[in-house]
Amino acid sequence: YSGGGLWNNTTITPGIGTSRPYEYIGAPWVLPDNTAPCPEGVIMRSCSFTPSAGRYEGQTCRGYQIILKPEAQYHSLLHTIELMRHFSEHYSQFEMLPSLMTKIADPVIEEYLKGNITFDIVQEHVKGEEQKWIRKAKRYILYEDAPYRIK
């Protein structure tokens, strides 16, 4: 959900009102193809769905079903922002609402979404921010399993 929840601040629906919210993403104007970013361990299956609630309620939407392969390591935030940039570069109907940047509140991610820096730069930035958080949170963690890290 860390990345999927950001779709609510765009003109893409995260499948609210379907049997697979946050697994389906799309809009009536999306024409799915094989150019959408697809990290290792993920299948981006073309699909259509009709939400019974939320944005595009009752309208047929086309897009993708995000399927994780068994044992896949998945970084929802990074994949979501990568997909957002893809939609902004391929669909004039795609909009990032002002509330999106308020929720992101990170200048490096904002610059990536605006097309000003590469994915490698934002990926390293997020990795660094996660490591800083882990160091701060370490004294409060009650378990030994390491939180997910970007490899």
Task: Please provide the spans of the model-predicted regions.
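C-terminal regions of mature proteins
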Residues: 113-151
